[in-house]
Structures are given as C-alpha cells and as structure tokens.
Amino acid sequence: MVLFSYIVTYNRPKLCPNAIWDADGTTVFNQSLIGYHARGIFVDSNNTLYAVAQDHSEILTLFQNSTIQVLSKRVQLANYTGIIVNIDGEIYLENGTESGRIVKWAKNTNNSMSVAHFPGHCYGLFIDHNNSLYCSMNEKDAVVKMSLNDKTSKIVNVTGTYTDGSGQNQFSGPWGIFVDNNFTLYVADSGNNRIQCFQLGENIGTTIAGNGTPNNLQLKYPTGVVLDADNNLFIADKNNSRIIRVIRDDYQCVVGCDSNSSSTSDKLNNAYALSFDSHGNLFAADEYNHRIQKFTLATNSCGNPN
C-alpha cells in the first residue's frame, strides 16, 4: 500500500524508437574539474548536472545556462559513491569517513547531516516515489532500503543473499540501480554481466539484459542503468566502453558502438554511469578519459531538443 507519493527529480524522456544521438560528445567537465575518476553523475528535472569530483573532494554542478559551480569543498567522499538529488535540491551521497554512512546537503549550503547508515558501501543510490532511499552494496552483494520519512526507520533487505553468486536471487557486485513508478527495481549486476529486474515484493529477479538477452546481447561489467518514459533500458556497459539501449526484444548501441575505448569525442573509455536531461540529451561519466560527456539528441530523431 502506497502511503506517500513524492515528486522525483530524475528525467525519463519520451524517446522515439528511431532516436539517435550525435556521435560526437561535448566535454562538460574535464579532468581539471572532475579529477582522475569520473564516476557519479545525476541530472535533475531542472536540467542541472551534478557530478562527484572525488579526487578534489568536491561536488560540481552545471546549470542549464552553462554556469559551473562547486557546491561543496573539502567533502569526504567514498570512492565509488552514487549521487541522487531530491525535489528540494538536497544532495545524497556516501561519506568517505565511514562505510555506508549516507549524508545529505541542503540546497545552497555546505552543511551536511547524516541520514542513514547502511551495512556496506553504496555504489548506487536511488530515491523512489515513497521517499525510500535504496543502496546497492557492491561488496555485500545485496540491495537494501530505508524510509526517509521516519528517523527511526529500519533498514530493509530488498534482494540479494549477501553471498556472491549467479542465481536469480544473487548478485556478483551490484552497482547502479533504478526504481520505476511501480517500484520495480532494476540492478546493474556487474560481475554477472547482466541487468536484473525485481518486481515489488519479490527477491527473485529476471535477467532482462546481458548473457544473450535480448537478441544475444553480451554485456561486460555494466555499472549504470536508467529508464526512459516507455521503460526502455539504457545501460552503461562499462568494460565495453559503450552505452546500450534495450527496446522491446532487441538492443541498439548509442555511444561507443565499436566497443574500442578511445579519448576521441565519439568514444568512451569505461562508461561508468549515465543520466538524461529533460530534452533527451545523454550525459555519460567517461571514467578513464577523466571527463563527463554530453551527447545531444539528434534534431532529426525525436523533435528539436534545446
């Protein structure tokens, strides 16, 4: 039973089946800004891009008017923390001083407060419509959650056995996560080279991408997953250095389609994470090229993005 309904801030653009993106990306954060490790990113409904500059202990933002701002300096950040922002502009990520401790920053402040303490590092974070905070514990092989509505809320195991494995109720290093409007959970099960789907209340998953599904799709250590408005999957296929779109019973490559890593503008070198703005433009954390790339939705595909 749904007791609360919160407005979420992530974008799920409506995309045509024949949508394509410009082959050449634009660097929005380079190495001097993002540091050596380009990992956690998030674009909110105001089209503000948030990025974790872990090496600089900073959180970066890029506003729609192209203004860059450093939100917080001298922040202790966990190496692989995800990042999520709620409707009030509060930023959630993992503090680097203590495993599993999630902190939030109120909008326009440098002050943080602890909101959760999970039993392992959170490589992926997500907030659903019920204002529940999810954590994918890569090293514990489980996904857990807790309500942000009640300070006394307990941590609940969503799925995973806390043991590395390839069963449909197991993970081998879960990474990026996404929860849709029906509270269906999608998990990038990196070590098993697949994307797993879990219906509400179920701890037995279904493989919906990877290991031959669909149409012989082979993923290699996927670490990011998001959905568009029609529940089509977009996957950061990390070690194949590409972004994949799964639509119906087939898949398409969006970026890095020859799977050869490079530093040219049309390539990625370890596609770590991705996020959309409201226009359908795609942002990718290009980890080993030490940059965040923007790939614009082509004007001859699904209308005229701004």
Where are these regions (language model features)?
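Beta-rich, blade/repeat-based domains predominating
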Residues: 34-46, 76-91, 118-133, 164-184, ...
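Blade/loop signatures of beta-propeller domains
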Residues: 3-24
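Structural signal for beta-propeller blades
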Residues: 57-60, 99-103, 141-144, 193-195, ...
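A short beta-strand motif characteristic of beta-propeller blades
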Residues: 26-32, 68-74, 110-116, 156-167, ...
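Short loop/turn segments that connect beta-strands within beta-propeller blades
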Residues: 63-67, 105-110, 147-151, 199-203, ...
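Blade-level signature of beta-propeller repeat domains, shared across WD40, Kelch, NHL, RCC1
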Residues: 269-306
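Beta-propeller domains
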Residues: 50-74
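Residue position within the beta-strands of beta-propeller blades
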Residues: 50-53, 92-95, 134-136, 186-188, ...
